[in-house]
Amino acid sequence: MNETLSKFNIHQIINFISQSNISGVVIMQKLEIDVLDQLKLRTPLVQCSEFNEVNDISYITIDNLEATRKMLRYILNAGRKQIALVNSDPARYTYAKLRLQGYCETLEQAGITVNPLHIVTVPDGNFSTAVSAISALLKTASPPDAIFCASDIMAAAALRACALEGFRVPQDIMVAGFDNIDISVMTTPNITTINQPRHDMGFMACTQLLSMIADPTKLPQRFILDTELIIRESTDF
């Protein structure tokens, strides 16, 4: 389960699980607690990547706070101070909430006042929407000298926006993303990013689910995995 879910198809899924011979479910979309409570009555559950903090449901995720701190410290050490965050919706996604928190905390610890105008929310994470939002940011009186994006898709959008508005990357503006997906090495310049251990998360989620199916009395577990900073051309010159 990893697509955007409406209330209607949530009920469809609950009914489907109730009426089918399903042994367990790995959830990759943040679900409301009441929905998780309904699902866990019907089948073993493991949350993977996105999660809601529920005492009796396991999850595997990454350390979004530390990953953000890692990227911000790298950019700050490169001498950039006016760092913008292009994020998904913190009210909707746990990872976006944690990355916003890490962004604000790291800047404050560096003695830099967070500029609300440098926090851009792109709720759908869409490339075209992000290009428009970042272009608007670059047209302001105080454009950033670095842009940290919550995904590589939005970082690619930042590269496009910089090109449209006449900014050089990385000379004028550093650009960094998150995820280390294929697009990060398909752009010019290549995108500095945070590598998520996607294989490990998937493997651990399935292993945890299988152990819960084998032993229904097994207590829930939480695994928070580390990430890796991948430095590429969009910040390195």
What positions do the PLM features span?
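Active-site-adjacent beta->alpha loops and helix N-cap segments on the catalytic face
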Residues: 31-42
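Bacterial carbohydrate/catabolite-sensing allosteric modules
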Residues: 11-18, 23-24, 40-47, 51-237
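Central regulatory/effector-binding core of bacterial HTH transcription factors
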Residues: 1-33
